[in-house]
Amino acid sequence: GTSVVLDSAVSAGNILEVVSLAAAAVENPGVLAVDSDLTSTDSGQVIHSFDRAAFRTVKYIVQLEHDSDNKYHSEEILLSHNNTIVGMTTYAQVLLDSNLGTFDADISGTDVRLKLTPTKTNTSVKLRAIRVGA
């Protein structure tokens, strides 16, 4: 809209600040949660995918758990693509007793895929994603 409606009266001399987000758009607000359990150590298991036309960049916070022997692994991943190739960096890695897997990414058809090769069977994946539109 083009008007501002106040909940209460404003007195003379008061300062009123109006911030407009008209130039900004929030698409798919919030953090996407994707959780899964991987029962094998097969290479390149897809743990998340998204339409490459919808999103250009995704930041992930990943937590891997192997509860039966108290092993935990967390890290952040920043991923971006140009519709042909995927660029990805992993950082802020915290390993408690074990490295539970390695990450990779690719484009398959219209999807960008985040993949994991776990080092142990029965690895739980908790993934949180912040997506930025294309």
Show which residues each predicted segment covers.
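N-terminal assembly/attachment segments of tailed bacteriophage virion structural proteins
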Residues: G1-P29, A54-V58, E65-D69
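Terminal beta-strand-rich extracellular "head" domains
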Residues: L78-S98
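Surface-exposed loop/edge segments in extracytoplasmic proteins
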Residues: N28-V34, N70-H73, V86-T89
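Beta-sandwich interaction modules
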Residues: D37, G44-D51, D97-S108
